[in-house]
Amino acid sequence: MLEVVHLTKIYKAKGGVETKALNDVSVRFPEKGMVFLLGKSGSGKSTLLNVCGGLDSPTSGEIIVKGRSSKNFSQSDFDSYRNTFIGFVFQEYNILNEFTVEDNIALALELQGKPKDKKAIRQLLDDVDLSSFAKRKPNTLSGGQKQRIAIARALIKHPEIIMADEPTGALDSATGK
C-alpha cells in the first residue's frame, strides 16, 4: 500500500550548512493496523510523515503508493493523494479561526470536491465530543478541543491512511484514550 525506499531528506540552511533529517530510510507500511514512530525530538519523525504525505519532497529516494512510484506523479496526482488517500493530524492544528468548527471540518470535503455532508459532520462532532461547539470559532476553544477538530477533519475524508504527528499531545489523558 505505502512504502518508502532509500528516502533521504537534507535541509540546507541559509549559511549553506546541511542537516540530514532522513538518511536512506526504507519502510513498508502494512495495509491495515497502526504504526507508531518513536524517537527523540529532532530524529526525523515529522519529516518522514511530511515526505510520505507529499507535503515535502525527498532529496533522494521514492515513495511507492499502491505499487506506483511518486516519481511519476503529476501535480494533480499529488493533490489527489493528499486529499483522498491520506488524512493528516499535526502537532499544530492548522485550524482556520475565520471558519466555524463545522466549516473547518467541511473544508476537507470541499478539497475532495465533495458537498458538505452536515449529517456526517454532526456525527463526527458528536464522536469527538464537540457537538455543542459546531457554530463556534476555534479561537474560543482550548488546545485539546482544537486538536479534536483536526482529528474530525482527518476522519471526515475516510482516507486509507491517517498520518498523525503527536495527535494526542494537546488532549487530556481521558480524551486521548
Regions found by a protein language model. Give the residues of each.
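ABC family nucleotide-binding domain
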Residues: 2, 7-177
